[in-house]
Amino acid sequence: MQVTTRTMNKSKHIALVAHDNCKQDLLRWVKEFEDKLEDHTLYATGTTGHLLSKETGLKINCMISGPMGGDQQLGALISESKIDMMIFFWDPLNAVPHDPDVKALLRISAVWNVPVATNRASAKFMITSPLLAEEISIEIPDYEAYLAERIG
C-alpha cells in the first residue's frame, strides 16, 4: 500500500477507552497525568468519558458507550485522521460482548498508524514522551492511491 504523511499538531487529539474492569485504573492514570492531558483535546467512549470528566473536571468529548457503538465512533474518527493517539486499557482476561468492535478499533488504529497504549506502563511512556508536545509527521495510508488502484 502506498503511504502519505499527515501532521499531528502540538496539541494532540487523544482517545481514552477502558473496559469495565479497567476504568478505575484508567481514572488513576488520568489523575496522575491530568496536567499533561489538559493541554490536549480528549475523546472517550461514553461511560468512560463521563466517569473521567466527573472525577477530574477535564473536558472530554464523549461518544456513546463502547458496546452501543462508541468504539465504532472512535474508529471512524481515526479513519478521518481526527485522533492522534489512543490510551485503551482493555481487559485481556475477560471477554466482552462487543469484542468484534474492540478488535476493529485496534485494527483501524494499526491501519492508520495511531499509537495505542494498552496499560499503565505504555501509557506513561506515551504521555511523557517529548514528542507529545511537538508537531510531528506520521505515515498513513494514501487513500486516494488506494481508491485509484481499486477502481482503475
UniProtKB/Swiss-Prot annotation:
Q: Name one GO biological process term.
A: methylglyoxal biosynthetic process
GO MF, one annotated term = methylglyoxal synthase activity
Q: Keywords in UniProt for this one?
A: Lyase
Where, by residue number, does substrate bind?
A: 19, 23, 45-48, 65-66, 98
Reaction(s) catalysed by this chain, per the record, are:
dihydroxyacetone phosphate = methylglyoxal + phosphate
**Which InterPro entries has this protein been placed in?**
Methylgl_synth, Methylglyoxal_synth_AS, MGS-like_dom, MGS-like_dom_sf
Q: Give the Enzyme Commission number.
A: 4.2.3.3
The active site consists of: 71 (proton donor/acceptor)
Q: Which residues form the MGS-like domain?
A: 6-152
Q: Which GO terms describe its cellular component?
A: cytosol
Which cysteines bridge via disulfide bonds?
none
Q: Into which family does the record put it?
A: Belongs to the methylglyoxal synthase family.
What NCBIfam families does this protein map onto?
MGSA, PRK05234.1
What function is annotated for this protein?
Catalyzes the formation of methylglyoxal from dihydroxyacetone phosphate.
Q: What is this protein identified as? A: Methylglyoxal synthase
In its UniProt entry, the species of origin is given as: Photobacterium profundum (strain SS9)
**What does the record give as the organism's lineage?**
Bacteria, Pseudomonadati, Pseudomonadota, Gammaproteobacteria, Vibrionales
